[in-house]
Amino acid sequence: MNIELINTNERFILINNGNKDKSLNIDKHSVKASISVGVPKNNEKVLTRIENVKGIIGCIQLVSGHYLMIFKEHNHVATVTGKKIYQMKDVELIPFFPNQQSLVSIPDQDAEEQHLSMIRWLLSSENFYFSYDYDFTLTLQRQYSTTTTTTSGSSLGERCDSRFFWNEKYVTILSKEHGLGDWILPITMGFVESKTLGGTCQFTLISRRNLNRSGTRYNVRGIDKKGNVANNVETEQIIEIKENTFTSFVQVRGSIPLLWSQFPTLKYKPSVKFYGDEKENSQALEQHFKQLHQLYGSTTVVNLIDRKGAELKLGEAYEERVKSLKDVHYVWFDFHSICKGMRYDKLSILMDQLKDDLKQYGFFFVEDGKIVQKQQGVFRTNCIDNLDRTNVVQSLITRHSLENQMASVLNKQIPSTTFKGDQFEYVFKNIWADHGDAISTQYSGTGALKNDFTRTGKRNFQGVLRDGENSVKRYYLNNFKDGFRQDSYFLFTNPSVDLTTAKQHESKPPSPLIWIFSFVFAAIFLANLYLPSATSSIGGFISQTTVLVGSVFFALKLAMKYQASIVDKPTLFKLDSIYKN
């Protein structure tokens, strides 16, 4: 699709160059949209004209007024059932009026620039996907299971899953009037990659991130009282054999569904804090699993956290509540303990525990446009972050599902060698590794740990070193950058937030951290200046080492004391408030 955008002093006029019979008009004063027959005659002053706009994200209101969000580039990443899926690129926010920012106070102007940078950062992350004619928010099973009367004549925006419709609240002006729905283009944060196998078979992996309770690693954990969990992602693997013949297998990941937090405090592993009473936690958990059952059927919980430390308390609280639920099979596999020493071959122990459920749940299979069988249940996998261990296990689960698919139906459709050999191994492992990196970056800021196993099928020393590098990056980002990133998620997913009273985000680290490190360097400098050289005598070595260790220890104590001022925290909302609503 190529859209011409004409920006006048009174309205935006959008013309689909593929269909000039109708044009979309957005009135800047009333913020209402309407359809005009043909290209309207325009006697108004044209401020700007942009050709080849690829889509409209919607209209967002900030302190100074409204902005039209568009994107001007896209990248074709996959084709599913003959319909193309694209990655959104080159986002632009256009103010309704050129001088609208100058009409507000200088502090409000500064705050608005910051809010604009948050929106631009999120939308320009290249993590958003869309399709002009494919309902990207629904799995293939849900698309085929939806009745014709529900979808007949309806636009994409009217039938998609609101959990994955990230710009739903920004296109309301297009959904209120008849005939405007065709301009609605749902965008979804997630991951899409597709490769060809054996010349004709298409292997596609799609992930959709739930916008409810979205955010960053340590700022958003657990569940809210509506049953929404942090880092909630639905992943669908599609094997397309020929036109109208394909299989689909779906699984999900999400934070442990209890009221708990782990806010950053400069500690490598911050303390876990629990919220609410027994009733509140049970109600939230039951609501979550009720939603899972309505969407997918029976649930197998694969809990990968440690049976020691803070993770043990979480695991025990989770196990106690979830075992009383019907249609839920709970498996606690202590990944780190069982697979320590890079013994990832021991993951076969877990797969033996899951094989019966894999057979029972099956997969979705359509042959020549007709439903042959449906997937009857879902695997819900989690670790503490729902990233690294989770991605490793999800890739194994889907591989075993693929083996079942090949044994039961695909062997009649394609050669048995399609899912064997070097080409398949390369495609499968690399797509799942790319997926792990993308989902991890959205939540933690870095690629996934343990991804060398996903990419190559084995752990190696180089992968361990890469994990160390990513762990250091995560520590820095989670403590000193995630406040801004969390505010970006919150601002975009909560357009009703009152920005007139919101506190402006401050860059970190502030002066306390500077003073602390200045003290360390000063102590080291003075030690070198006045104490005997560390190389001249044992006494000199002991003296300098004592000063160095003491300075570092004192600096760390000061840092922990002032961590509230040092850690980059979100400012658009109070962190604790998300556990009270």
Curated annotation (Swiss-Prot):
It is found in: Endoplasmic reticulum membrane; Golgi apparatus membrane. The keyword Transmembrane helix applies. Pfam families: Syja_N. Its EC number is 3.1.3.64. Residues 533-535 are lumenal. GO terms for molecular function: phosphatidylinositol-3-phosphate phosphatase activity; phosphatidylinositol-4-phosphate phosphatase activity. One of its GO terms (biological process) is response to Gram-positive bacterium. It is an enzyme of class 3 (hydrolase). It catalyses: a 1,2-diacyl-sn-glycero-3-phospho-(1D-myo-inositol-3-phosphate) + H2O = a 1,2-diacyl-sn-glycero-3-phospho-(1D-myo-inositol) + phosphate; a 1,2-diacyl-sn-glycero-3-phospho-(1D-myo-inositol 4-phosphate) + H2O = a 1,2-diacyl-sn-glycero-3-phospho-(1D-myo-inositol) + phosphate. The chain crosses the membrane at residues 512-532, 536-556. Residues 1-511, 557-581 are cytoplasmic. It is a multi-pass membrane protein. It comes from the Eukaryota. Residues 119-445 form the SAC domain. Its main location: endoplasmic reticulum. GO terms for cellular component: endoplasmic reticulum; endoplasmic reticulum membrane; Golgi membrane; pathogen-containing vacuole. Keywords: Endoplasmic reticulum, Golgi apparatus, Hydrolase, Membrane, Transmembrane, Transmembrane helix. Phosphoinositide phosphatase which catalyzes the hydrolysis of phosphatidylinositol 3-phosphate (PtdIns(3)P) and phosphatidylinositol 4-phosphate (PtdIns(4)P). Has low activity towards phosphatidylinositol-3,5-bisphosphate (PtdIns(3,5)P2). PANTHER family: PHOSPHATIDYLINOSITIDE PHOSPHATASE SAC1, PHOSPHATIDYLINOSITOL-3-PHOSPHATASE SAC1. This is Phosphatidylinositol-3-phosphatase SAC1. It comes from Dictyostelium discoideum. The gene is sac1.
